[in-house]
Amino acid sequence: MKIVAEASVPYLRGIVDPVADITYLHSDCFSPDTIRHARVLIVRSITKCTPALLQGTDVRLITTATAGFDHIDREYCESHGILWRNSPGCNATAVAQYVMCCLCRLALREGFSLKEKVMGIVGVGHVGGELKRLASAYGMEFLLCDPPRSEAEQDNSFLPLSRLVEQCDIISFHVPLTHEDPHATYHLIGEAFLRSCADKRPILINACRGAVADTQALIRAVKSGWLQALVIDCWEGEPDIDLSLLDLADIATPHIAGFSADGKANGARMCLEAITEVFGLEFPLLHTLAPPPPTHPIIDLSLFPDHRIERALLHTFDPLVPDRSLRASPKTFEEQRKAYPHPREMKAFTVVGATTEEAKILRGMDFIS
């Protein structure tokens, strides 16, 4: 079977090659000529699978190592007998890890305890669900807002956004970008919402889609003191981000929240599982697909006099590292994404020197203890 894979999809080499004829191409080398005889494509979101690319080719399955699938023309695929599969939830833990580590940084800077804060999670899909799990393990109180799920499931445990504004110290957004009513999310973080935050002054986090937030409204909100802190990973108009907003954000990163090595491995694995599902092609070495171990896999809590859970989390990922890089060179936003050294998730780290209570919390967040 002929497969063409994007060269930036990791961990495929040595697993696919023994059982299929696979070619690795950089995304800008994908063309009707280079993929003409491929039955399967393995791509990321940078490769646009449009009629201009697919017409006249032998492609019958497109797999993407990403949760998102806006880069695939689904209508064209359906009308031309081309199946497609995405990788839902592949980086959900990575995004939740990002949020928790950002909150740890803010807690250390401001001197508050996260256990005293109420977190509001807007959008409770794969990512929101993982964030709920980690926050619960940590011992945080949380409220959930997901209007489409509330409507579909008739579940009154989901609250309206206005209730989160009234009760939450932290509001983290994990919604898709949609323009269609009744649950449009475009500029959901807009002037009206931000003005309503003025009394409670929450920490606001956007780690979903840039255009979920109105850039100019965010700038006004920070300047007006409506927010305690602002964390931004996703930006309107990226890679050409607004420099005024960059200056005002407390933590600013170049859309890397989901970029863990584990998330990349999950995406690659799910692509190969889709090929097996559709064509029956088995990959005997699939069990070996795994990211490399972290450079420093042992976390010794005895080295830290206080804030030990926060220090353990920040050992896995410190958002101030990409924050400093972005502030130093905002014009290289895309280059920083491409060169980003993908961190490992918590399950790759062993914690020693923990108390019984700390060990229970850390195990709940996937650490080995």
UniProtKB/Swiss-Prot annotation:
Active-site residue list: 209, 238, 255 (proton donor)
Binding site for NAD(+): 146, 233, 258
InterPro entries, sorted: D-isomer_2_OHA_DH_cat_dom (IPR006139), D-isomer_DH_CS1 (IPR029752), D-isomer_DH_NAD-bd (IPR006140), Erythronate-4-P_DHase (IPR020921), NAD(P)-bd_dom_sf (IPR036291), PdxB_dimer_sf (IPR038251)
Tree of life domain: Bacteria
Record's catalysed reaction(s): 4-phospho-D-erythronate + NAD(+) = (R)-3-hydroxy-2-oxo-4-phosphooxybutanoate + NADH + H(+)
PROSITE patterns xrefs: D_2_HYDROXYACID_DH_1
Alphabetical keyword list: Cytoplasm, NAD, Oxidoreductase, Pyridoxine biosynthesis
An annotated Gene Ontology molecular function: 4-phosphoerythronate dehydrogenase activity
Single biological process term from Gene Ontology: pyridoxine biosynthetic process
Pathway listed: Cofactor biosynthesis; pyridoxine 5'-phosphate biosynthesis; pyridoxine 5'-phosphate from D-erythrose 4-phosphate: step 2/5
Ligand binding (substrate): 45, 66
EC number, as in UniProt: 1.1.1.290
GO cellular component, one term: cytoplasm
Subcellular location: Cytoplasm
Broad class of the protein's primary localization: cytoplasm
Subunit architecture: Homodimer.
Protein task: Catalyzes the oxidation of erythronate-4-phosphate to 3-hydroxy-2-oxo-4-phosphonooxybutanoate.
Protein family membership: Belongs to the D-isomer specific 2-hydroxyacid dehydrogenase family. PdxB subfamily.
NCBIfam families according to UniProt: PRK00257.1
Name of the protein in its database record: Erythronate-4-phosphate dehydrogenase
Organism in which the protein naturally occurs: Porphyromonas gingivalis (strain ATCC BAA-308 / W83)
